[in-house]
Amino acid sequence: MQVIRQRRISEKQQVNLFGRHVGRRALLVTTGIAVALGVTGTAVASTYQFGTQQVGQTTANGQVISSDQYIKPYGSRTVINDGKIMSSTVSPDGTRLAASVTDGDASLVVMDLTTGQIKQKIGTSTADDLRISSGAVGQEGPTYSPDGKQLWLGQADGYTKFTVNADGTLASPTAVPIAADGAKQALVGAAVFSADGSTVYSAVNGQNKVVAIDAATGTIKQSWAVGTAPRGIALVGGTLYVSNEGGRPAKAGDTTINSYGTDVPANPKTGASTTGTVSVIDTADPSAAVGTIAVGLHPTAVYAKKGAVFVTNTADNSVSVIDTRKGKVVQTIATQPWPEASVGYEPNAVTLTDDGRLLVTLGRANAVAVYRYSSPQQPARYVGLLPTDYFPSEITTVGKKVVVSNTRGVDALRPDAAGHNTHDTTSSLTRFTLPSDLGVRVQTAKVFKQNGWTPGSVKTAASKSHAKAVPVPARLGDPSTIKHVFLLVKENRTYDQVFGDIPQGDGNSSLTQFGANVTPNQHALAQQFGLYDNFYDIGTNSAEGHNWLMQSDNPEYTESSAGEYTRSYDTENDVLGHQKSGFIWTGAQAAGKSVKDFGEFQSLETKPAGATWQNLYCDSKNMAATGAETAYPIKTGSAIPSLNDVSVQGFPLFDLDVPDIYKEQIWQQDFEKSGPANLNMFWFSNDHTGGPANAAAEVADNDLAVGRMVDKITHSKYWKDSAIFVVEDDSQAGLDHVDGHRAPVQVISPYANHSTVDDHYYSQITMVRTIEQILGIHPMNQLDSAATPMYGAFTKKADTTPFTAVPNRTSLTLGVSPQPSCGSDTPAPQDTKAAAAPTTVSVPAAEKALAAQWKTWASHQRLTGPNAVPDYANPTQMNRYTWYQTHNWTKPYPGDSKIYAPDDVPGAYLPSPESDG
């Protein structure tokens, strides 16, 4: 346990690639916005307040985090450097806090609440104080027995039961398994003990049931069928109240989308679930039918006190209050503090103080909402907000102190001597005594400031707007000079990995793996259209990253599933991973715009026989030379009907057995035949690495595909009114000297500022808001509603000079075995002024045995084939494998003293937080 010292970063001077200074244009940009406001009367969102600040920097407003927010919590803070807290509980005597954690060096930690020190770490590492067999942890728990002598930790296949020593540490881990139901593991949710401690009632999330377990023997005594994905649970007398995140079972005639083998009632357009329920179980009468109470969407936490059961409706942004005497909802409390947006606050925990103050954590707003509450029938009165750390997820009281567990703590700032990575995750506890109502209101203003919530952030044009067209209009629906937006999604790279070798930017070349001789097109695009060296991806991994791009949010369901990712990983085909406000494509359609999707957010793929990497590589060359259609038509699809309707067949999704230049040819044929839509989305994924070719070759393939695509667009009749955004889904697969979330982005348009270095803070959220503003798409939630569009990246004066793709300098067939029948790829000469890229796959004799071990390891990581899963591999291992390949097995990974075997990598004991099971 330690408190992280915040990095203090001085503002640097930004240098134009051609000598123009734009780094100090914060005043200019602000002035431009003010002029726009003076003309239109439209207020603007407030993420421009970041200026050129960097993530991790401490400012007067708080610490900058990667989600367009500041954090500066009320009360005291204790940072936990052992990963993200998934759930936590306080011991009955109030002296200890037990927290399940993930993405770090433990699965469970026990903290002394008096000293703030970690007393014990439990996990799968040899360095942990107590070893257990599995590191996977569930969404809810752990749970103490009423006498404090036992603690039960929820895991994928049941529980691990511990005895509690006199000093609060744990001992004697014992498995309490719950058998799988076919392919469905238990995936236990919350648990609660009977008053006498003899029975544990468990919400078996993966099997849609609740079970009663004998606490002494682990035997299941009784089982009740409930709704879909039971999660929270509370015991009031002899009655259980269980939240079903997926709602009621589907009925005949329902439109449904699957979640972990269960069909869930769903909206076919938004892909979101449409019901939420609480199951009511009489534990004293085994024959009694299970009752059902309808609540809001995605009911998660359940808390009972003073004749009421409180249920957080995470997707509906409300709290249902159930009167236990009446057995029904008697009031619904709104948790939508900012009038500009009704979605995206994500209430996820609740408690009631003895003096009648209801406290609700708002995970995505980094705040606790405070209400005055007296009884179930008397409407609660909103008081205000208290700031927390990043993504609060649990709240309780210990004496007069409020204790808040924050899943993401202070963001990815775990100490790392080699550089920063998104998996350097932290969590934190914040503790405070509740201030007076006046004090809460004072803190409310700080929460608004930290979130950028300002009045008038979302304004729409009048029905008959006569505004002059500009690239990024100030009001939604006003005309834009840009009619066609292309969103190209790539995989996993940090800024330093790709652009660290560009001296004009804020880079560190020692961390650059894919410099100018691997990514000549991205470097040329940066030279022509501008370099952005202060842009951030928000997610830790692909499960989160694609959500941020498509929903401008990573829903709480995915956030809280990171301890095991067994229900789903990428939630494209999981109804519970979708917000009720829909996606960027549904917003475009609602605005009357056309959409085409090429692989992005899709989840289904069928390939014909013979569709190997080698054959598809040769096929792409034939298509380019002759214009012939592919010889290997690939079928793709989505579980979301609205995405299926706009998907272009034949364009593969994530599949490292498919070259990206093949994908580019599939797109090019459609482009030539039918032209672009208003919104065009793509998934070019081979810079993920791990496929048949050497890592450098895969990134070169990705680079060439992007370069050719931009070449084609910029030489077409559509170029004059187009904008292309090239972005990574996340930046987890490498290191960055500023922050692990810093990533490359490219803004390509006649209206983009050309040949500049822009060091203003931007993020995936501000990029999404820019696209929304261009196409007139209403923002999806409070995050993109608060975001300032990337006004500073655009200019009113068009420069229609096209881009000409640069030949690849790294062989695309490097490392492929056998080589394609059409011959090996011969690259262009490398730039001798840039760092050399691999030209052969050579392994020093001393490392051949290690390289063979890595090859075997890679074959088990689901990187290719019909069951390929993005980021299935453990990230600490995958990042080293890629590094070793790009350095010909001659150089240790940054911060390491040697080249490791897969099982010896520090962190290799971790279950992959990206594994889908």
What are the residue ranges of the model-derived segments?
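Short, structurally constrained coil/turn elements
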Residues: 39, 166, 326, 376-379, ...
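N-terminal secretory signal peptides that target proteins for export/translocation
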Residues: 1-22
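N-terminal pro-sequences and low-complexity stem/linker regions of secreted or lumenal proteins
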Residues: 425, 440-917
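Secretory targeting and sorting signals
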Residues: 18-46
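Predominantly soluble domains enriched in secretory-pathway, periplasmic, or organellar proteins
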Residues: 45-470
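Residue-level signal for nonpolar/aromatic packing positions in well-ordered secondary structure
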Residues: 35-37, 429, 771
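Intrinsically disordered and other compositionally biased segments
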Residues: 8, 13, 33-35, 44, ...
